A protein has these predicted regions:
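A structural motif corresponding to the C-terminal lobe/cap of the Radical SAM core domain
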Residues: 1-138
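Membrane-proximal basic amphipathic "stem/tether" segments
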Residues: 122-161
Length: 161
């Protein structure tokens, strides 16, 4: 899997049990997950599994927030060296390394990668999530934070449309 190829030190089947442990700790812990799509070895089915997996974690209430991006191989990383060696880089224009567009060659068309990233964000925007966030309001600062979050969320959706 991608987690293995990137040496993340965790298997996909460990993610949900670990999140359950975090949630059982109580308090105000709010797990955040980052999901990336667009690896050169990733099939459309793999990427769709990432979307579905994330959506399932949200449905179960195991994550509170997420970041979805198209993978970017930054200079100095193993992925960048591997991408350079295997001719996976589409560009070396650093202005384009902002996670808003595919930089790596992928078997998945660019438009589809953008749509998948957008779908990851949309997977969290459920009635339960909105209701939970509204119930969490305790102060004016919470309301301001939620408005800023909604603005950022809409901005992310627009980035990937």
């Amino acid at each position: 899997t991608t987690l293995d190829r990137l040496n993340k030190g965790i298997k996909i089947n460990q993610v949900e049990p670990e999140l359950k442990i975090i949630k059982s700790a109580g308090g105000r812990l709010e797990p955040h997950v980052t999901c990336m799509v667009g690896y050169p070895w990733e099939s459309l089915a793999d990427a769709q599994n990432t979307v579905n997996f994330t959506k399932n974690l949200f449905k179960k209430g195991l994550i509170s927030s997420l970041q979805a991006t198209i993978v970017i191989p930054y200079p100095g990383t193993k992925l960048f060296a591997q991408a350079k060696k295997n001719h996976w880089l589409k560009t070396l224009d650093w202005n384009k390394y902002d996670m808003r567009q595919p930089i790596l060659k992928s078997p998945i068309p660019d438009k589809k990668l953008m749509q998948l990233t957008r779908n990851i964000y949309l997977s969290c925007f459920t009635p339960q999530f909105i209701f939970k966030k509204l119930l969490s309001i305790r102060s004016l600062a919470d309301i301001k934070f939620l408005f800023r979050s909604v603005r950022k969320f809409v901005g992310q959706l627009l980035d990937f449309s």
